[in-house]
Each structure stands twice: as structure tokens, then as C-alpha cells.
Amino acid sequence: MSSISIWTERWFLSTNAKDIGVLYLIFALFSGLLGTAFSVLIRMELSGPGVQYIADNQLYNAIITAHAILMIFFMVMPALIGGFGNFLLPLLVGGPDMAFPRLNNISFWLLPPSLLLLVFSACIEGGAGTGWTIYPPLSGVQSHSGPSVDLAIFALHLSGVSSLLGSINFITTIVNMRTPGIRLHKLALFGWAVVITAVLLLLSLPVLAGAITMLLTDRNFNTSFFETAGGGDPILFQHLFWFFGHPEVYILIIPGFGIISTTISAYSNKSVFGYIGMVYAMMSIGILGFIVWSHHMYTVGLDVDTRAYFTAATLIIAVPTGIKIFSWLATCYGGSIRLTPSMLFALGFVFMFTIGGLSGVVLANASLDIAFHDTYYVVAHFHYVLSMGAVFAMFSGWYHWVPKILGLNYNMVLSKAQFWLLFIGVNLTFFPQHFLGLQGMPRRISDYPDAFSGWNLISSFGSIVSVVASWLFLYIVYIQLVQGEYAGRYPWSIPQFYTDSLRALLNRSYPSLEWSISSPPKPHSFVSLPLQSSSFFLSFFRLSSYGEQKEISGRQN
């Protein structure tokens, strides 16, 4: 068998969860770079009043649509759920692979054609200038007569099918493939985050599929679901879309919660504070996420009682979110904190997610949101939660687990520099947008009065700093692959804290199962079923011995 056919079979016909996870991460990196390029175009256009680079407002809106859909469906979800989820979940539960390995492969390979459809949609005719929300009548056939919106709908359908298949796989794996000793209440928090996310996807995506299919038939088959002339109602689309759209933002952030819990615990050198509380907080956030969707729609003419209910329900979400924030702070408190790149990103996440949550409390109030709706205040709010929440969680997870994924260490100094560059860049970009929103600058408009030019210039400068940080990240990955030194099984262990006691040594060494196997893991991770004892968190399996642990920790020193 030739090396080319072996390579093709490994990467194109793979049924190995670890290889598929790596494919997801590569795909997310590519999509993220594409989405970042679109975001820089937006910020360059807004760097000054009047026309800068993009004379056509339709093109500007098409860029905004492409940026949003790329970042949400093709960057954050494939990285956090597809990438880290696939690679780590079988290791965390002690299983050999995912429950349905071939289903896993098809759920990845649906994404590249979906991405192509989205890119075609942006390039054909004037592009889909609807925003990611694709509201009718703007997305209707009168306003967008070409095939752009249809292609965007097909792209969403394909990525939705991919996510649904992945969700079924994750739920089945967690329920059926846990090794003896890992009860649900001993599962790593990242495992809980993935299964909660999978349930949310399973419940919300069919609603989106129904809404965009109805829009497709309105556009092409003369139905009138959202056409007032035929007895339809465009507000129905908003209800259907946001019934999916609000759980979607929790789908994006809950895996991040799991990663941050893992990394803060690892680099504070103590267990997560309030494990059970953390699990139930994530569950509560997931459930409450389904009953608050109309807070996106305060300005469409909802009844005053309806607005009062959605304000109250939205504010209640702050309670489980606050539990998580304070539990992370309590985990840090009294711990032996090491400011590794992963820990820096985790602390950055906590800081900026808190700021995003505070502006969310403001927007939850119907009376205030009447003023803030569709201004840059909203843009600042959700970018603090996503651009600095989900993305910082991705980097935290990457720097924590990449020695396990690649088996190579990375440059600590450069990766800390990347954190500070990105931290400064995103704050410079999005903090001024709060002020622009308070002054009433509307979203999705490519021109603005001269009075807004100062804060916009600072915001655009911040986006350039963020892009430099992204280039630095690519360079860090490059030198890791070319010059990286071998990483042991658990490169984050602290040898000076070891005692002569075997139990203490092993307790220190492996906070969860994935660190008990080689770096990078073999295609079939566990030769025999690992056993998790109730007294300490460790897997015993063939080839594992005390001598090997001492040899590995000695090699790290």
C-alpha cells in the first residue's frame, strides 16, 4: 500500500476520533482566518466617516453576514465542540473511540461543502446582505432576487445536519461508553459541557431548519409563511429564528465553560470549587436559554406583559452564570497559581465574560433595550461574550491540551506575548463600541456622522492589533511543529511538589484520564479498559508503571 493511499485513508476515510478532532481544529483555524479577514474589512471601512474602501452598502452587509456565519458555525462550533470534543471526550470517559466512528467522519466532511456554499453565496451577484439573522422581508425574493440567500440557507442546512449527527454521537458516547468507575458525577466538567451542548443542539437546530426551509419555499415556491400579502407574518420568522438563536449562543459558550473550569483547576493546583454546583449551573443555563428568546425582539411590538416576563426570565440567567464566575474565582483563591499561557487566557476569559455579562444585564431590560436595540452597544455586548469569551476559551484549551495533541511543547514567551497582544487588541476594538452605542450609532450601516469618528478610529486600530496577534499565533504553531521538544504524558506536573508517597505522586500527575496515556495518544488509546478508583483519579492499564512515571517526570526536568 503506497504512502499516499495510507495518508488518504487516514485523513479522508478516518474513523479515529483523534484524527477527526485534528481535522476539525484545522478547519476551524482556516475558517477563523477567513472570518477575521472579513472583520478587518468591516473595521477598515468604519475607520473613518464616509466611504473608505467599500462604496457599495450591499457588499458591506454581505461581508457582515459572511463574517458572522463563518465565525459562529465554521470557527467556534467546529473548534470547541468538534475539535476538542472529539479528541478529548473518548479519553475523558475512558473509551476506545466515539460511539459511532463513521458517523463522526461524515459529520466533519459535511462542513467543507457547507463552507464552500457560504463562500459562493457571498460571491454570487450582490451576496446575501441580510446579516446572520436572515430576517424576511429583506431576505425575501423581492429584496434578494438572486441565489445568494438560497445558497446561504443550504450552507446552514448542511452545517446543521453536521452538528445534529455530532450531537447524537456525543450523547451516545457519554451515556454508553464510560469506563467502570466514572459515574456521571465523576465526569470531567468538559465532558458535562459537551453533553449539555449536544442536548441544546438537538433541541434547537430542528427549529432553525424549519424556519429557513419555510423561507426557502417563500422565496422559490410562492408560499406565504412570512409574506404579509398572503396572510403570513415576518415576526413568526423572528420567533422561530431566536428560539434557535438564543440557545445557540449558549452552545457556543458552554464548551468554553468546561475548558475554563479545567484550566483554572489545573493551574491553581486544586480541584474545581463546587463541582456539583458547576454542573447544575450549566444545566440551568441550558434550560433557561430556551425560555428567553424574545429579548431579541423587544422592538417588534410585543405586549407589555410579554416584555415584563422576558426581562425577568433573562435576568434570572445571571444567577447560574454568577455561580460559575464566583466558583472560578474561589478555585483560584488559595491555590498555587501558575500564570501559564493557558491560565492567562482563562483569567482573561473570566474578566471579559464578566464585562459582557454586565452589559447583558443592561440589555435584558425591555425599556432600556428599546434605546440600545441595533446599536453598537449590542455589538460590544456579544463580542465581549464571544470574541473574548469563546475565543479566549479556545486559546486556553489549545495551550493546555496541544502538548497532548501534538506531543510537542510550544514557546512559552511567544504564547504569553500573543495573549497580551490579543487582550489589548480586542479590548481596544470593542470597549469603545459601548460608548458608540450609548451615543446611538446603529449597527450594519457602513457610514456614520463625523461625531462618531474618534471611537471608531480607536476600534479599528484595535482590530489591527488583534490581527497581529493572530499572525503571531500562526508563527507559534509553526515553530512548535518545526522545533518543539517532546512533551511528556503530563507536561504540567510540578515535580517540586512531589512526595515519596506513590499515591500522592500519582494524584498530582493525572487530574483526568487523558494525561495517563502517551503524547500524542496512540490511535487506539486504551489497550484495556482503564479503571477509575474511587479513592484517587487515575487510570491503571497495561504498560503503565511507577518506573515509567518517574522516568517521564525526570525527562521533563
UniProtKB/Swiss-Prot annotation:
Names of the cofactor(s) = heme; Cu cation
Coiled-coil intervals: none
> Which positions anchor the lipid (N6-myristoyl lysine)?
K324
Q: Return the InterPro entries for the record.
A: Cyt_c_oxase-like_su1_dom, Cyt_c_oxase-like_su1_sf, Cyt_C_Oxase_1, Cyt_c_Oxase_su1_BS, Cyt_c_oxase_su1_dom
GO MF term list: cytochrome-c oxidase activity; heme binding; metal ion binding
Binding of Cu cation, residues: H246, H295, H296
Name one matching Pfam family.
Answer: COX1
The enzyme's E.C. designation: 7.1.1.9
Where is the 1'-histidyl-3'-tyrosine (His-Tyr) crosslink found in the sequence? H246-Y250
The source's domain of life comes to: Eukaryota
Give the reaction(s) catalysed.
Answer: 4 Fe(II)-[cytochrome c] + O2 + 8 H(+)(in) = 4 Fe(III)-[cytochrome c] + 2 H2O + 4 H(+)(out)
Q: How does it assemble?
A: Component of the cytochrome c oxidase (complex IV, CIV), a multisubunit enzyme composed of 11 subunits. The complex is composed of a catalytic core of 3 subunits Cox1, Cox2 and Cox3, encoded in the mitochondrial DNA, and 8 supernumerary subunits Cox4, Cox5a/Cox5, Cox6, Cox7, Cox8, Cox7a/Cox9, Cox6b/Cox12 and Cox6a/Cox13, which are encoded in the nuclear genome.
Q: What is this protein called?
A: Cytochrome c oxidase subunit 1
